[in-house]
Amino acid sequence: MRTSYLLIALIAAIAAAEKYAMVFGTADGWGNYSITSDPCRTYDDLIKAGIKPENIIYMTYTSDLTYASNPFKGMIFTDPAPNTDGDWAKYGCFDHVDYTDKDINKKVFLGILSGDAEAVAKATGKENPKVLAAGPEDTVFTYFIDHGDVNMLYIGGGHINVDQLLAVLNTAYKKQIYGKWVWFMEACHSGSMFLNLPSDWNIYVMTSADFAHPAKMSNCPPNDKVAGKSLDTCLSGLWDNSYLDYLEQHPKTTIGEIVDAVMADVKKTSAQGVSEFGDMSFRDLPLSDFFGLLPTPSFRITRAAPESIVSLDQVPMHLAKWRAIRADKDEMASAVAEYERLAFESAKREVEVMRLGVSLMNEKAADAALKTASESYSASCVRDLSLALHEKCGHSFPFSESAMNLLRNICLPGLSVPNVNWSDICM
């Protein structure tokens, strides 16, 4: 009899458990097209997989839909195609956006993750803002895409560091506003955000890159054509499309199976180092426990292998080059001028990073430090030097892989931020 009661209780608990999801695409602009397209695709798949719209929190920009040079207003794509059948907006993702524009900032993001409705209401003016409010028996799936650097993520116009992210995850754990939580995160150096994630918080994370590498975009020019028209941007993230393609073809996959498959797939064309963190027992669980179960067979055809793969820090230069290549006579001068401007800025950043290096070590050591990353480093030192280069010299994020290599070699374990005369470094 006792066994029967326990079985009934277990079945009741499973039936009562809910699935929740959060989708974050927190960078704006046509050059960040994939930070709008892949979240839309993820949202649409979550709905197709049975997640209730009211159980999904969706943060994204929508300006790409009306961008002046967008040849397909109101549409969004992740793959090149001979027609517009691959438009993800037609499934309704943008009808369900909870946070956009000025509400995309670190205060709102951290408030959502920690279940702090009062803080989010104060920051947004929303009367009943959606925040994480699952229960201790519920599952949560989170997809995030934006730029990143070592121990930093960018949210809108600001950034958060690794300590802030781990603090809100700890708050959510203590508040019991989730049962089990799976994160899929796309950002350069995203692995650096979870190196110290405890394994007993019931959280599992797959990141698009390890601590040392930038992420890469795919379907960039010249592989950016839809219905015969060039979009002049990168349509998707390499890792993002890999996991979505695999999931749509293998809806009953376990977490371990999809992670292993994506690691192998991305490794064919990139050394970015897809990584995993947290509670490794999650690998045996069906991803459908978190994402829901997509229709079988897949509603999409198998896509071709990704092409035109570009490191995220090189995307602006790559896009400017192809705009100049494709420009007609009326647009040629301005397109080439923009490419020249970005080339000069890239050269300036490279020189300033090297000037920083030779101010702290000899020239041969600095040159070697550009080429190989130190595996052990002071995260706070790297963060502070990165921000100083941004604020003092005007460097843009994400930094190049070589620049991050140098900063990690400057910031060896136990060392504080060196004294730097930035007037001697910045040009």
Which residue stretches match the model-derived regions?
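Cleavable N-terminal signal peptides of Sec/SRP-targeted secreted and luminal proteins
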Residues: 2-17
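Cysteine endopeptidase catalytic domains of the caspase/legumain-like
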Residues: 13-427
